[in-house]
């Protein structure tokens, strides 16, 4: 059976989104996994812990014997069924464990005995992880253009429309502000970095890439932080600033944070619970900046938010949200962004409305 073991092989796996059957324990998978991986563990968390303790106390032979004892009979049959189904569903896939050691080899052998020959990743997740880290360091050396602008300027959409754009917020599953959470939970830091590396590799492989187009982000996007190598390069990058009329920005924010989020919550949870989740989402976002707003201003805006939600529930109209959104932008978000932009004014190379910035970026 052909095994993958070169740097180019590892990169090819990430670029192709090759399905990976990851047989590590769930706790390991949650700490970090590759984008196209599915977790079908050889041992669950408790079994892995027991084998690990046995290894420390009695050595490798005893640990291996315990592992075979724990994963036997009906448990082994159930897991074999899952592995076999995954292999048949993903004939171009590959097995993976932590370091390409006993776990993936055991599963590979059991599958072979069942009539399925399936390759494994030599070096395992650790080798793929090192490839992802190295690829990000290497690809981050290419020139970068950042898209800046106040909240509601359509920066993310502009990045998404560029063939050399990488949507950092989309990969992080967070839009970067107090109201930035999405319905998808954020990945672990390692999984986010792996996903980013794979996206950069795929984007680079599709074209003769001369530069990256990224959104002007802070170091943190929700609970994820940008890799230091990329963040350092972004601090040196040229910035194109979108300066759209205030009314256009309000329309975008209404669509994104009120209409779309309400739709997404009700689609995920049903009308009643979805409405409660939507209300909690908006209140949580406002509460996150309570200290910066000051208690009195926060209470005023929170009351206006409650009124707007009542209006939206009874009439379907989101217009009432302008009563708290407009002052929030003018008193908090816009001054904050302008202050941040002033500190890097020498990096600004172009300013214009959304369409003008889009044309300028494509010409670079």
UniProtKB/Swiss-Prot annotation:
Ranges of residues in domain Rhodanese: 14-137
Keywords tagged on the record: Selenium, Transferase
EC number: 2.9.1.3
Entry annotated with the keyword Transferase: yes
Pfam families assigned to the protein according to its UniProt record, in alphabetical order: Rhodanese
Active site as annotated: 97
Full protein name: tRNA 2-selenouridine synthase
UniProt source species: Shigella flexneri serotype 5b (strain 8401)
